[in-house]
Amino acid sequence: MSDEILNGAAAPADAAAGPAFTIEKIYVKDVSFESPNAPAVFNDANQPELQLNLNQKVQRLNDNAFEVVLAVTLTCTAGGKTAYVAEVQQAGVFGLVGLDPQAIDVLLGTQCPNILFPYVRTLVSDLIQAGGFPPFYLQPINFEALYAETLRQRQNEGTSLADSEPAGNA
């Protein structure tokens, strides 16, 4: 089924089986860790400040497959200096066969990022620890609420995640 979905053709048996949502591939698209002020930052007694940015992009690969990229940038500063910047883009290819556009939109905006998020959490934590800093655990994110907010914003535009190349922010 994987080759058929990635090549844009659903097998006749799949169509007869009804709607399908499949995980075709999960992979790291991009990863970066910088600690520009190490090792001096390890002795900084200032309270660290964290800034988290989250972004989701969706790209239609063909009629039955979509790439979803969940991007997280975590910036830690202490005493006005950057302690570290961790950037992760975790991606997945998802097969969506026999579903109406609204169901596809909901799955792309909620289920797919929920599937990718544990991978992002682990990678961010591992990067930060490998950089010599205490572990940081991303807290759960309510992608359903983010999707509902995004949906309200898009209703006036008449767009959907499935129709767009990159879908923008989540």
UniProtKB/Swiss-Prot annotation:
GO terms for biological process: protein folding; protein tetramerization; protein transport. Keywords: Chaperone, Cytoplasm, Protein transport, Translocation, Transport. SUPFAM superfamilies: SecB-like. InterPro entries: SecB, SecB-like_sf. The keyword Protein transport applies. It is found in: Cytoplasm. GO terms for molecular function: unfolded protein binding. Signal peptide: none annotated. One of its GO terms (cellular component) is cytoplasm. Belongs to the SecB family. Homotetramer, a dimer of dimers. One homotetramer interacts with 1 SecA dimer. PANTHER family: PROTEIN-EXPORT PROTEIN SECB, PTHR36918. One of the proteins required for the normal export of preproteins out of the cell cytoplasm. It is a molecular chaperone that binds to a subset of precursor proteins, maintaining them in a translocation-competent state. It also specifically binds to its receptor SecA. This is Protein-export protein SecB. It comes from Xanthomonas euvesicatoria pv. vesicatoria (strain 85-10).
